[in-house]
Amino acid sequence: GLEEGVVTPGTHYPCSMGYHFGRNKLGCHAHKSPVDFEESIMMSCNAYYCYILRDLLENKKYSTIGVAMDRWQEYVKSFGFGQKLGSDFPSELGGFIPGSGYYNKVYGKGGWKATTVISLSIGQGEIGTTPLHMANLCATIANRGFYYIPHIIKDSENVRIEEKYKERHYTMVDTTHFPKVIGGMYRAVNSGFGSGGTASIAAVKGLDICGKTGTAQNPHGSDHSVFICFAPKDNPKIAVAAYVENGGFGATYAAPIASLLTEMYLNKEISEDRKYLEERMMNSNLMDRVKVRRR
């Protein structure tokens, strides 16, 4: 949205528990309204991203919604989505990012519009991705617009690291736009409880963790808890994606787990004031939320 000029850091959009279109609604949680760009990330406002996708797909600079849709697809794929990243992880999956061809096949050419695909704006709908893709997205944001192909071995005296793992892969989004995204992620974690930030539970003193919560809808049971983060804010050393099946809101399980991993990696220990959180995560059991299909 920033790259296309359909939104600026100062653009405000309203949110009344979601994005309303016709008799339908893509839901959101209660928070202040309206919100600007950074606040939308800080407060995890679904409606904000619905407005951005709508304005992108209905942008008059594109001759048809199909052309705009394919432009959106190009942007998303430039972050590594919808394809195998080429890592040395076993059984890597490529995922799926839909374009106009997909929707023309499903609905017929001219048979769909922005509201038909509005759930794409929050990473749902027909989007298929993996935790590796999400961790790579987080690393890309931390790097202000580029990523390295993920691989298992960071360094070794006896193993030569292939050159492809040292090459930078740049996105289609200019590096000047990433500080505002990072600002929102920083505020999501470090604004303090009661501020509206959805990831205050992930704050660790001195680490400047930047993160974004997510809740993946699950038609077969409790929603999945999702969180991505990197740290520190400047000169980052680690990026994490946590996905907890049936965990509910991102701040409930994924954010605590990811922040504990980040803290241990950077500090080599868990601080005393967060030991309770470590114990709670280690002793949690979500098996009662899993629906078993009987044959």
Report residues per predicted region:
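Short, gly/Ser/Thr-rich active-site loops of penicillin-recognizing serine hydrolases
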Residues: R160-K164, R168-H169, I257-R295
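Beta-lactam-recognizing serine transpeptidase/beta-lactamase-like catalytic domain environment
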Residues: G1-G247, R289-R295
